[in-house]
């Protein structure tokens, strides 16, 4: 694919995701099926609740990840800078969007060591698509992606549905697991696998862990639907109809999280996919997540400034802190033991 086509596609994606009426799946995340048992006597000081955690040797002041969002369009440079500055100020993690354009063209879209300069202390994750592993990418490209941003780990994203409904998408996914296993064995940093909004099943998660993957982002249904995004940018009515049929496809985030945690009890898990506030983040942690990711929910703020991103996440962090307080949880370990009532099926 030409540089112009790649960049045009990334610009289309950004424009569509910025309009939630065009991209959000009607499928719920599943978190609405759960409600915390309220603790009317917490015996805690709200301001002393400890939200700290760690992953891959980096300390985080809160269990939050700015999820992979944008990596191709020229305007991504400002967005990524705003996100990095905010992540550093807040002490949370950040994953960049796909680095394919930066790896295959002369442009970097802000995906350089400057991100590390802006955020010297954060957990920073590089990213490219799994389909590229059977189209020529290997350890060298993975190293370049990580070194480009001075990252701590590499996300390899699984997006077979998006590729299947996308005009010109990658249709041959044979050999992807074997390529992931080879990459995990040879890359000197951890490999994280994530979906992009259709979820990861228990069976797939188990195969990934057996292949040497260090962590999994379940990235379930309920947030951005990339099938809906591709329907919105389809080249013709037939392609649009094909994509629209899958707009609600996927495993809801809560259901995926429960299943993968049961199948992989010792694997670090990230919950993303439609998590809108700190109460849902608290539910995700109680259900087994180590970190909670958010992407589209902060994109509008990221278009404006790092201060807007900080304000957005300060609200979410305070919501998470109050959820801990009102469940009698002094820290994240306590939150994982809180009583979560299931009111209905996910």
UniProtKB/Swiss-Prot annotation:
Subcellular location: Cytoplasm
Taxonomic superkingdom: Bacteria
Molecular function (Gene Ontology), one example: magnesium ion binding
Stretches that traverse the bilayer: none
One GO cellular component, as annotated: cytoplasm
SUPFAM superfamilies assigned to the protein according to its UniProt record, in alphabetical order: FMN-linked oxidoreductases (SSF51395)
Residue positions binding Mg(2+): 163
Cofactor entry: FMN; NADPH; Mg(2+)
Keywords, alphabetical: Cytoplasm, Flavoprotein, FMN, Isomerase, Isoprene biosynthesis, Magnesium, Metal-binding, NADP
Enzyme nomenclature, EC number: 5.3.3.2
Enzyme class: isomerase
Positions annotated to bind FMN: 67-70, 98, 127, 194, 224, 274-276, 295-296
Pfam families with a match to the protein in the record: FMN_dh
Reactions catalysed according to its record: isopentenyl diphosphate = dimethylallyl diphosphate
BP term (GO), one: isoprenoid biosynthetic process
Amino acids binding substrate: 9-10, 98-100, 162
Role: Involved in the biosynthesis of isoprenoids. Catalyzes the 1,3-allylic rearrangement of the homoallylic substrate isopentenyl (IPP) to its allylic isomer, dimethylallyl diphosphate (DMAPP).
Protein family membership: Belongs to the IPP isomerase type 2 family.
PANTHER family, alphabetized: ISOPENTENYL-DIPHOSPHATE DELTA-ISOMERASE
Assembly description: Homooctamer. Dimer of tetramers.
Name under which the protein is recorded: Isopentenyl-diphosphate delta-isomerase
Organism listed in the record: Stutzerimonas stutzeri (strain A1501) (Pseudomonas stutzeri)
